Design a protein with these regions (language model features):
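A short hydrophobic beta-strand segment most commonly corresponding to one strand
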Residues: 18-33
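Intrinsically disordered terminal extensions flanking catalytic oxygenase cores
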Residues: 29-435
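Structured loops at beta-to-helix junctions and adjacent beta-edge loops in soluble globular domains
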Residues: 5-7, 24-28, 70-72
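Short helix/loop capping segments that flank catalytic or ligand/cofactor-binding pockets
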Residues: 12-13, 34
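Conserved metal-binding segment of the jelly-roll/cupin
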Residues: 1-9, 15
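Eukaryote-biased feature marking scaffold/signaling PDZ-domain proteins and nuclear chromatin regulators
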Residues: 7, 18-20, 62
Length: 435
């Protein structure tokens, strides 16, 4: 006979012969007397506190560490209060040690989701062939469903992780044993597989590395976290220089440092409003200089679209007039050819909201007129990248352009009208100019 506690890990194999009897008991402690006490882990806690406090000094550790747990937990039950056996004992040591060493500690679910191509192994019946894993084409390693040590939920989005962050290094040695679901070939698709593995884990990092950890998770993780930090800082009185302001500023700096580099991700950040979100966050933190630097590097020097204009106009209102006009000129010079409508709207916003005095807008307005798409021999060659080709002006955008030019300098407006009328192939009289 063999007996197990229900929450102990054990393996049950198919019966080769005979029968299996299962007797299930609920064990309840009765009677008076002192409750059993957990062992004293004071020495281990002291040692762990010292190791965590030396995290930054070692120089060899990643920004976060992941300690997978022994027992299985579902999304519904995961929580520090629900930990069992060795996991509860580990939490008893980790919680005070992390607090003493100024580390953030979370409980999360660790998931590995892999898909790819499967190969026939040559075994099995022709009606029920056997497969084996061939090539992994997609792999996602994420941490999600976060819980704090006080039992509260965290709204932090999923974070990616790597094997180098696991402690111990072989903690996921049983990943290869995870159940694999194979799908037979259909049509033009070959045989495929999907493997899903999930386990609970402690996740911790030094509090002063929080910004780097969140920024590494991508804009979908870091920007919501930044907005939450700023919201809490503003609710606490918005005192510039206090701990909340410094924490939000550190995260904003980390986001700037890890801004996407791939051109398609940069465009996605602009069209998705994430560039505008960061500019807005920097302005709320009174980091006008940082917002201007980001705009020069990532907007004028990267991707730009109409979604950026409200934040850019707000930035121009906070800058010195000459600096605002110069920044506006940089954006228009870089993007007037491909985004003429967005540039006209930004110019109109700055004029209407008084962000820049009208005399100072003459330079940016002239740059916009010079940068408009042209069908003449001096016209810039259309980029091979389709996403960077000129966006045709709409009738409303054209009306906005002429209106703002009239307000800035009537002579510029006359030049614009003459320019447009002379290029009917680009600026159709019936669909654009007459309306």
């Amino acid at each position: 006979f063999a007996a197990f506690y229900a929450d102990c890990r054990h393996e049950v194999l198919p019966i080769a012969s005979g029968y299996r009897l299962a007797l299930i008991y609920n064990l309840i402690r009765v009677g008076e007397g002192p409750l059993p006490q957990a062992p004293d882990y004071g020495d281990q806690q002291t040692q762990l506190t010292r190791l965590l406090a030396d995290w930054d000094r070692s120089g060899s550790l990643p920004d976060k560490l992941i300690y997978p747990l022994e027992h299985a937990y579902t999304e519904a039950e995961i929580g520090f209060a629900a930990l069992k056996g060795q996991d509860a004992a580990a939490a008893q040591v980790l919680i005070p040690a992390a607090a003493a060493a100024s580390c953030d500690l979370y409980l999360a679910l660790l998931s590995v989701n892999e898909t790819g191509w499967a190969e026939y192994s040559g075994g099995g019946h022709w009606r029920d062939p056997e497969f084996e894993i061939g090539e992994v084409s997609y792999s996602a390693w994420t941490l999600h469903d976060w819980r704090r040590a006080d039992g509260s939920l965290s709204e932090m989005a999923a974070l990616p992780f790597t094997e180098e962050e696991l402690s111990p290094a072989e903690a996921l040695a049983d990943l290869e044993d995870a159940e694999v679901e194979f799908s037979e070939a259909t049509g033009n698709e070959g045989a495929s597989f999907e493997r899903f593995y999930q386990r609970a884990a402690f996740v911790l990092w030094p509090s002063d590395r929080r910004g780097a950890v969140l920024a590494a998770g991508g804009l979908g993780v870091s920007l919501p976290a930044l907005r939450d930090l700023i919201r809490r800082w503003e609710a606490a009185g918005a005192t510039e220089g206090d701990a909340g302001w410094r924490e939000a500023g550190q995260l904003a700096s980390a986001i700037r440092a890890q801004w996407p580099q791939a051109s398609w991700l940069v465009r996605q950040a602009s069209s998705g409003g994430q560039s505008a979100d960061l500019i807005d966050a920097l302005l709320r933190l009174n980091d006008v200089e940082g917002a201007a630097e980001f705009t020069t590097e990532r907007v004028a020097g990267g991707a730009y679209g109409p979604e950026d204009n409200p934040a850019l106009a707000a930035l121009c209102r906070r800058l010195a007039p000459e600096a605002a006009a110069g920044l506006l000129g940089q954006i228009i010079t870089a993007h007037a050819f491909c985004r003429p409508g967005a540039c006209a709207n930004l110019l109109a916003r700055c004029a209407a909201e008084g962000a820049i005095a009208l005399p100072l807008l003459q330079g940016p307005a002239q740059l916009l007129l010079q940068g408009l798409p042209d069908d003449g021999p001096a016209s810039p060659t259309a980029p091979q990248d389709y996403s960077q080709r000129p966006e045709p002006l709409t009738a409303l955008q054209l009306a906005e352009l002429i209106t703002v030019l009239v307000g800035i300098d009537a002579a510029l407006a006359d030049q614009a009208v003459s320019f447009l009328l002379a290029r009917p192939a680009l600026y159709d009289m019936d669909s654009l100019l007459v309306p």
